[in-house]
Design a protein with these regions (language model features):
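Extreme N-terminal starter segment of soluble prokaryotic enzymes
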Residues: 1-4
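Active-site loop/lid in soluble adenylation, ligation, and acyl-transfer enzymes
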Residues: 8-20
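Short, well-ordered beta-to-alpha junction loops that form the rim of enzyme active sites
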Residues: 9, 106-109, 149
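Divalent-metal-activated hydrolytic enzyme cores
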Residues: 14-17, 33, 45, 63-94, ...
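Short glycine-enriched, charge-decorated loop/helix-capping segments at active-site entrances
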Residues: 19-21, 118-124
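Short, surface-exposed acidic-centric catalytic microdomains
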Residues: 22-72
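Short acidic/polar active-site loop segments enriched in Thr and Asp
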Residues: 101
Length: 150
């Protein structure tokens, strides 16, 4: 069976920044009938705890953080950039280890957002962009889609 990477929070795992568990959607359940699911939470892989500060990228996209052009900051001012980049690298290693077909990642997440992320102002505004892990996966040829595109 072919494998896909899926954000662990979309699978009902307790990994979200606020420790809220999200119910597994029917579209995610349907994927498990066609693919072997490889769960991933880049933020936890990078060493961040649950719960943790809400974080936002202080640049246009996750690629900026990967390339050292901006930081990923928590809402209390903590610089979480190294954890986000490390988690993205470990997510890429996991994707390669399992030879995944593609990744389904959580939209608007500073790690996993694939088309939209928060602006970095912590005021709820969003703009086009991708999270750190989504950017690194794409940079390495892995297709990334949002759960909202299923």
């Amino acid at each position: 069976m072919k494998k896909i990477l899926v954000s662990a929070c979309l699978l009902g795992e307790n990994v979200r920044y606020n420790a809220e568990v999200v119910e597994v959607s029917d579209s995610i359940k349907a994927l498990s009938e066609k693919y072997e699911i490889v769960p991933v939470c880049p933020e936890v892989l990078g060493g961040l705890e649950v719960p943790r500060e809400a974080c936002e990228i202080q640049g246009l996209s996750g690629a900026d953080a990967i390339d050292g052009r901006c930081a990923v900051l928590g809402n209390k001012g903590t610089d979480c950039t190294a954890a986000f980049v490390s988690g993205a690298q470990k997510s890429l290693e996991l994707a390669r280890e399992h030879d995944v077909e593609f990744a389904v990642l959580k939209e608007r997440s500073p790690s996993c957002g694939s088309t939209t992320i928060y602006t970095g102002k912590f005021d709820g505004t969003k703009h086009p962009g991708e999270g750190v892990a989504a950017a690194l996966l794409r940079r390495n040829g892995i297709k990334v889609i949002s759960e909202e595109q299923l």
